[in-house]
């Protein structure tokens, strides 16, 4: 299966999503903000970056820009609970697979990850 980096500042949600993806057979790693996520991306190769948009230190938009520039083959899937953040992600359309709206049900995020990995 895939090696996935879950970057989310809400620890309960981050652990919940990572655990669900592990149950699907994926190898997951977790980061609490964009800067930590970028460090982890530099240290290891991942198949998918699943990141919240609104985070401290470095937000998911900046993380996605830098990740796409440094790791061209990386698939990027963003998550947000804020409509205005989704609009901010529009300029990333060529660099990301999709934006998943929070709150989401577990089948929704699993489906989004499967679709992202299939592309």
Label the predicted regions.
Residues 55:
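Receiver (REC) domain active-site loop signature in two-component systems and cognate sites
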Residues 62, 75, 82-100, 107, ...:
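Alpha4 helix (beta4-alpha4-beta5 surface) of REC/receiver domains from two-component response regulators
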Residues 11-29, 116:
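Two-component/phosphorelay signaling modules centered on CheY-like receiver
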Residues 29-48, 69:
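Acidic, metal-coordinating helix/loop segments flanking the phosphotransfer/catalytic sites
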Residues 33-36, 59-63:
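Acidic catalytic/metal-coordinating carboxylates
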Residues 8:
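Conserved acidic carboxylate
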Residues 11, 32-36, 107:
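Acidic phosphotransfer microenvironment of two-component signaling modules
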Residues 52, 80:
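Active-site residues of response regulator receiver
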